[in-house]
Amino acid sequence: MGQLIDGVWHDTWYDTKSTGGKFQRSVSAFRNWLTADGTPGPSGEGGFAAEKDRYHLYVSLACPWAHRTLILRKLKGLEPFISVSVVHPLMLENGWTFDDDFPAATGDTLYQHDFLYQLYLHADPHYSGRVTVPVLWDKKNHTIVSNESAEIIRMFNTAFDALGAKAGDYYPPELRNKIDELNSWIYDNVNNGVYKAGFATSQQAYDDAVENVFTALARLEQILGQHRYLTGNRLTEADIRLWTTLVRFDPVYVTHFKCDKHRISDYLNLYGFLRDIYQLPGIAETVNFEHIRNHYFRSHKTINPTGIISIGPWQDLDEPHGRDSRFAE
């Protein structure tokens, strides 16, 4: 854990003293857009046109934000277009590292850096801010396109369609208002909500955060009792964004982040939804529980100083879910 300040690495934990013990996530700094023809997107600069083998994705298999991008890459069939490097699951005094001595960690396959912060300095020698994954990298211009997962998945959704990406629109125009509304409260109360609970340093901050987590889960349980996915019977980015948190909830967040009022496996609809998406073609291979559990339990020394990995609980995600037949059109 740490950050760069004017190009110099500092090993620092999150500052919660000035916020009453509340965890506040910083805003992603690189917000350019990869588009079909290189025209500028909603933010940042233009010039990032979709091309085969021009872009590279840096991810952690532990990270729910990076996991979103791996799923869209899989669903859209972008493996031939976008290569990947996987960091080591442990994030300690030097942040994310490129050690390759853990199964499925690849090292930095482009520049052979030791640490992810060196890649950020490659793009901006005076960068100040957190060093996070995912990172969408432009191999042509040797710079970061984006480190905002919510925007990277939208780039992947459409940018390569004319070059042979798989069919499928996970942010369809007719559902965008509904998706945006879902994304907003799910991000605040579930995706980031578990971190607010886990990284809280006051009882009140924890109590407020964990109450919001389970209020939101109850709301989601109700929604998913009405149709197969969040917006109906069509898989969208809203489902993927929720799912990468749910798949980590019982193995990690219940114990490590003290989100232990209920497990996802206690909810009929949420647990079915979790298994449903896990069993979609290609999704299971994006999940690595060894990276997930080793990262959280062994990296966050502030909240788990011994680094002991808890025993569970575990789930059988291959168990039939029945949601396809239950909500058959």
What are these regions (language model features)?
Residues 1-329:
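C-terminal alpha-helical interaction module
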